[in-house]
Design a protein with these regions (language model features):
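Alpha-helical membrane-anchoring segments
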Residues: 1-259
Length: 259
């Protein structure tokens, strides 16, 4: 496979992440509405420039009804990227729409964004630059290094936390309303050794993930396989659907760089 082929594969995977994210917002319009948790009427008050001279322009784009239209544009762009075939101009335009939408989402609200949103922006942005300058190899290197940095940062931050080191983090997360699941909570709450093992496994995997870039095929495949299973389990237990696609979208870049 060529660098272009790996880049297109990254595009298709990140497009699925974008499509899932857009659909999650579109099926819950109240969340982004004026009375929702991510209300623009409240979010625009977080920064003075959002209500200053640029306020009218932002209102025209980020008000609830127009924001839904923007989400639909992003969804259509994601579908274009998923479709078979490598049409340079349509795919470049679609990537630009995805990146612009991700940036507008960051402007609209300072809250509610997670690592998947950031990874979508990083991957799509890197691929867009690669498209514009016909430079897929630097784009793939950028994405692979960003993935290694993201995993390592998450792992080292957990390592520094006594809550994670003690094993209390897993029962704590599984008991929450947003990310929790009753059966998973009971499983780790009643078996402290399993909770500690789970926390240690996550810390070890995330902290050592940059080793996937060293060029050792067995190690790279082991870490990518572990990452795949890790994100599948998170999607099933914590409903982190976008995380799976956003982070797995970096794996073709890692394969290109390391193998």
């Amino acid at each position: 496979m060529t660098a272009e082929s790996y880049a297109v594969l990254c595009e298709r995977l990140i497009a699925v992440a974008v499509a899932v994210s857009c659909l999650e917002y579109l099926v819950r319009p109240d969340f982004l509405g004026d009375g929702g948790l991510a209300s623009w009427s409240v979010g625009r008050l977080s920064r003075s420039w959002k209500t200053g001279p640029w306020g009218g322009v932002l209102d025209a784009v980020l008000a609830p009804s127009r924001n839904r239209l923007q989400l639909l544009f992003r969804l259509v762009a994601a579908v274009v990227l998923v479709l078979p075939g490598d049409w340079p101009v349509p795919r470049t335009v679609a990537l630009a729409i995805v990146v612009a939408g991700a940036l507008l989402a960051q402007v609209r609200s300072s809250y509610g964004h997670d690592g998947a949103d950031q990874m979508c922006l990083i991957v799509a942005g890197g691929l867009l630059v690669g498209r514009v300058f016909s430079a897929p190899e630097p784009a793939l290197w950028f994405i692979a290094c960003q993935a290694g940095l993201a995993y390592a940062t998450a792992g080292l931050k957990k390592l520094a936390s006594p809550v994670w080191r003690s094993g209390a983090a897993l029962p704590g997360v599984m008991s929450t309303t947003i990310y929790g699941q009753e059966r998973a909570y009971q499983l780790v709450a009643q078996r402290p050794w399993l909770a500690r093992l789970g926390c240690f496994t996550v810390i070890s995997f995330e902290s050592t993930f940059p080793l996937a870039l060293l060029g050792s095929p067995p190690l790279t495949l082991l870490l990518l396989g572990t990452g795949f299973c890790f994100h599948v389990s998170n999607a099933l237990t914590m409903r982190l659907n976008t995380f799976f696609w956003a982070f797995v979208a970096t794996y073709p870049a890692i394969v290109f760089v390391a193998l």
